[in-house]
Amino acid sequence: MQTPNLPAIRALRPAWNKGRIVGKKRPLKPKHVWAIRVRLELAENHRDLALFNLAIDSKLRGCDLVKMEVVDVMASGQIKERASVLQSKTRKPVRFEISEGTRSSLARWMREPLMIGSEYLWPGRFHERLHISTRQYARIVREWVTSIGLEASAYGTHSMRCTKVTQIYKKTGNLRAVQLLLGHTKMDCTVRYLGVELEDALAIAEAIEI
């Protein structure tokens, strides 16, 4: 007698996202940016302060930020006012500004012993790792947001990328500028990224009283 082929019985596993907030990560508000900067300055954490400032200015994806090299931001011994990085996702360059405060924190970080002879801007702590990983970067961001009392699950590396462009859009309404700054190839990507349609609809609704 042949035994029928029955489906294998597997133990049920809880969903990977059970109990987690996995939606779009929130941008930091200006007061959050200020609070984190002050804490890093008081702690004299030069690496993290430079990383935090450049993450906001560059608006780069985490995978591109961690791989940045010293030559990307420095020329002839001076920190550049503008820089360009080739995006790993689109293989297209994106330009960004480096503000005065960010240049100052980068220059201070460059003077650290760990940076002597380093090719990468954020060198790894161990010889086999040339630069910090995206996982390490995510952990660092989590430490930043929790240090000022924010919920870690609501923020992430994406928060760093969208913090400045969110303020730019709120103040100017210029979607094209945001598209260029983020390095998006299509405008609809930028619209979805910022949640523009929903935000605009809510703003209109809030202005109407019945």
Task: List where the protein language model places each region.
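Conserved catalytic core of the tyrosine transesterase superfamily
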Residues: 1-210
